[in-house]
């Protein structure tokens, strides 16, 4: 082996016997984790080995003194905690097995396992500050023991509840086979939590300091101990350095983690750097705190790390010290040499306060870290730390329904009628008032989490039940009249006066499908000049009225020539990397410069709507349905995609073909028995006649469930009826399993319940790797590609770097 190698072992729990599971002669997903956990840059060292260096010739960048053949030594403990998407997919099977289901992860560093575990639970953003999970508190002891047998995403919380109740370790170990060492450490946390709960309003200094040492936050201690004041106010953490050598050698890496046990090595490091700069006659730099986006999850992915990293680079290029805070080991932002300093800690107010106390920054940036960073804006405002860019009040104005409606009134911009509700009765009354269908969502969410279109009162009742069960009801639920039309999106850069729109994006799927799940095209293909002018005008009004400095994302619905606003987000969005790459406009760079006081007019990219690029770029979402059992593949207003690909070509058709192939769609030549299955809702049936006719002319045999089949035959498209999932054999399942079905088109019975026939059909198609199309517009796009004579060899390559070179 020359370079990286990943080995996985199985260790027998009661001896030192082990077996090799697999060996991968390459760097792996765990290589990134190991690099961040140890400070040892595995990929960089592997690259140097690949070009001819040996380990003893490679210097350790962290210490600057040792070579790469010194194996890292750790004087801390690291916990990696997966981020699963089950908070979005409430009906999904949460069982864990040999197939990976996590969308991301967090990493935490502590002086003890207990402290690291508490940090990890706080970082994972489940609304928990200890390992106590409320649903388990309501179970009996027998139910807890029974649930220990369930190997799912919540098992660690079930074990913790069992330990709190005094269920013996032997019983837990026999069921779970979780090592006794972990059980002992979790028992310690459980004992600390129970001890705090017994304080009854009297908390000793020793209890408080012990709780802090093992990872309990101040707000948690106050809640558990039922106290209003703590024995020590503003008891701040110190920071230790990740140095790869357990302090055996002096190190100069700016990579820290918090601890309540020891000296503040970060403060010493900062003082030494500042003294060195002063001795060399260098002016003191402005310090800016940059918040990352935490774990990768559906709706908040690697796009925000792109924004955070580009923000840091621009700050450094303009004479600022950029200090990064993040907890995701998979990101570039948590490379120790990306920023001037890195703090690997949770993104919550207390952790941030500790960093601020040590760093004493001049300002912070919240607009590039997604909703995770935006949630810190209010706290930053309260403690008086200036926010570079759009102020916290403007962020709240865009998120708060009533204030946003007032903003629209001032701007004279139309939107769909909507209401704010807090319970089921109010929701039903609002649905009656504004008329069904309605779009329902909790406020302050990203990725359309728990967002749905309710077509009936029964839907309203079901969805309010889902929302109230899975969402903190401190924030209201928003109901909007659902408008059918074309959805468009813009990301704009603003300097407080002028604005620049690099381009207008159009979603191929109409409104009602989350923009993150829709095929997206730049430049927009079907807007009139009047509609484009209106979108530009409205975006400018928002930018000026909200006093946006930096980035703003606005989503519009265009229906019958009228432009409605869907939402405004005064922050970076998931489309910023996409639109930056395909237009050649370095959006984050320009936005940061605006935040630092520069004007757009002086940056060389103009203002208003930027001229269109000479290419068409299509963004196609990628899904992971085969890994998430029980999740309905039906498109809707809640985002489900886990990634995306880009297709770029001189025209829309070729770009779409590239994108669909990149996303894993297959384009088969139909055989003599090849067939397609149709089962579509009534409102979609007229549009599917043309789609079905095109497939028939290509040589496909068509099958449909009773209603769809009758409709197609009525409109002169020959179709064969097939029984539904619950029908007698041979039914639609037998047809799917025959190996003859190339495509399934299913848009019927929107809903999350996995017991519904339509959901089961779509799941079966996924399990059999049969493409399942759940939106009319996606079906049209796919069929038009199928009908074309083009293949990849006919489509020219496009080097998007040329877009930048022309500037």
Each model region followed by its residue ranges:
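Extended, domain-scale alpha-helical bundle/helix-rich regions
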Residues: 211-214, 220, 224
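ATP-dependent carboxylate activation and anion-phosphoryl transfer catalytic cores
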Residues: 1-206, 214-215, 272, 279-286, ...
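Acyl-CoA thioester-binding alpha/beta core of soluble enzymes
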Residues: 194-197, 229-251, 256
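Acidic/histidine-enriched active-site and ligand-binding environments that engage anionic O-linkages
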Residues: 429-439
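ATP-binding N-terminal substructure of ATP-dependent carboxylate-amine bond-forming enzymes
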Residues: 120, 242-413, 422-429, 648-806
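Short, basic interhelical loop/turn and adjoining N-cap
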Residues: 175-183, 223-233
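Compact, charge-rich alpha-helical regulatory domains located at protein termini
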Residues: 170, 209, 223, 717-719
């Amino acid at each position: 082996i020359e370079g990286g190698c990943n080995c996985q072992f199985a260790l027998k729990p009661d001896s030192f016997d082990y077996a090799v599971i697999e060996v991968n002669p390459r760097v792996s997903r765990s290589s990134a984790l190991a690099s961040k956990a140890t400070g040892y840059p595995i990929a960089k060292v592997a690259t140097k080995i690949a070009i001819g260096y040996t380990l003893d010739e490679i210097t350790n960048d962290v210490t600057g003194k040792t070579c790469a053949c010194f194996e890292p030594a750790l004087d801390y403990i690291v916990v990696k905690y997966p981020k699963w998407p089950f908070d979005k997919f409430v009906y999904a099977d949460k069982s864990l097995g040999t197939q990976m289901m996590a969308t991301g992860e967090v990493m935490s560093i502590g002086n003890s396992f207990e402290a690291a575990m508490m940090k990890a639970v706080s970082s994972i953003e489940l609304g928990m500050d200890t390992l106590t999970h409320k649903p388990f508190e309501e179970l009996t002891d027998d139910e807890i023991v029974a649930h220990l047998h369930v190997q799912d995403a919540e098992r660690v919380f079930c074990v913790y509840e069992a330990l709190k109740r005094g269920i013996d370790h032997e019983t837990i170990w026999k069921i779970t086979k979780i090592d006794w060492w972990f059980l002992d450490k979790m028992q310690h946390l459980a004992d600390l939590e129970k001890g705090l709960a017994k304080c009854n309003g009297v908390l000793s200094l020793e209890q408080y300091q012990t709780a802090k040492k093992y990872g309990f936050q101040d707000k948690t201690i106050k809640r558990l101990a039922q106290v209003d004041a703590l024995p020590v106010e503003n008891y701040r953490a110190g920071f230790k350095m990740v140095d790869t050598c357990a302090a055996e050698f002096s190190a100069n890496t700016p990579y820290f983690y918090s601890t309540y046990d020891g000296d503040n090595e970060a403060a010493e490091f900062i003082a030494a750097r500042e003294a060195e700069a002063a001795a060399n006659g260098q002016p003191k730099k402005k310090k800016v705190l940059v918040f990352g986006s935490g774990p990768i999850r559906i709706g908040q992915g690697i796009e925000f790390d792109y924004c955070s990293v580009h923000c840091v680079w621009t700050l450094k290029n303009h004479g600022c010290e950029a200090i990064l805070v993040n907890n995701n080991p998979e990101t570039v932002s948590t490379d120790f040499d990306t920023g001037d300093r890195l703090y690997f800690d949770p993104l919550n107010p207390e952790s941030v306060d500790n960093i601020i106390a040590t760093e004493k920054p001049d300002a912070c940036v919240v607009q590039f870290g997604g909703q995770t960073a935006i949630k810190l804006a209010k706290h930053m405002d309260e403690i008086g730390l200036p926010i570079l860019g759009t102020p916290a009040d403007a962020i709240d104005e865009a998120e708060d329904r009533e204030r946003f409606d007032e903003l629209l009134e001032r701007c004279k911009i139309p939107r769909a009628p909507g209401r704010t509700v807090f319970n089921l009765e109010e929701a039903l009354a609002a649905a009656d008032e504004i008329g069904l269908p309605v779009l329902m969502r909790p406020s302050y969410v990203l990725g359309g989490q728990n967002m749905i279109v309710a077509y009936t009162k029964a839907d309203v009742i079901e969805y309010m039940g889902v929302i109230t069960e899975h969402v903190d009801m401190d924030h209201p639920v928003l109901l909007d009249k659902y408008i059918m039309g074309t959805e468009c999106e813009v990301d704009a850069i603003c300097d407080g006066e002028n604005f620049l729109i690099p381009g207008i994006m159009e979603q191929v799927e109409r409104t009602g499908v989350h923009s993150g799940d829709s095929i997206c095209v730049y430049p927009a293909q079907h807007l009139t000049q009047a509609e484009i002018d209106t979108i530009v005008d409205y975006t400018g009004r928002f930018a000026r009225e909200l006093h946006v400095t930096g980035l703003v994302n606005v989503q519009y619905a265009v229906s019958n020539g009228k432009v409605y606003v869907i939402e405004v987000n005064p922050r970076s969005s998931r489309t910023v990397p996409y639109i930056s790459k395909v237009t050649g406009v370095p959006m984050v760079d320009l936005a940061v410069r605006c935040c630092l006081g520069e004007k757009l007019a002086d940056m060389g990219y103009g203002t208003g709507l930027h001229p269109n690029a000479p290419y068409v770029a299509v963004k196609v979402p990628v899904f992971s349905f085969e890994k998430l059992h029980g999740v309905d593949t039906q498109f809707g207003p809640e985002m489900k995609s886990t990634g995306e690909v880009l297709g770029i070509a001189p025209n829309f058709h070729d770009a779409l073909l590239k994108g669909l192939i990149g996303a894993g769609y297959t384009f088969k030549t139909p055989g003599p028995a090849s067939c397609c299955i149709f089962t579509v809702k009534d409102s979609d049936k007229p549009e599917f006649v043309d789609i079905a006719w095109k497939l028939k002319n290509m040589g496909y045999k068509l099958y449909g469930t009773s209603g769809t089949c009758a409709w197609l035959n009525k409109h002169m498209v020959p179709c064969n009826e097939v029984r539904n999932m619950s029908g007698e054999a041979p039914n639609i399942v037998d047809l799917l399993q025959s190996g003859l079905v190339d495509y399934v088109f299913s848009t019927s019975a929107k809903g999350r319940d996995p017991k519904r026939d339509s959901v089961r059909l779509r799941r079966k198609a996924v399990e059999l790797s049969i493409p399942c199309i759940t939106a009319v517009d996606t079906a049209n796009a796919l069929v038009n590609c199928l009908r074309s004579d083009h293949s990849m060899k006919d489509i020219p390559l496009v080097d998007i770097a040329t877009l930048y070179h022309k500037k």
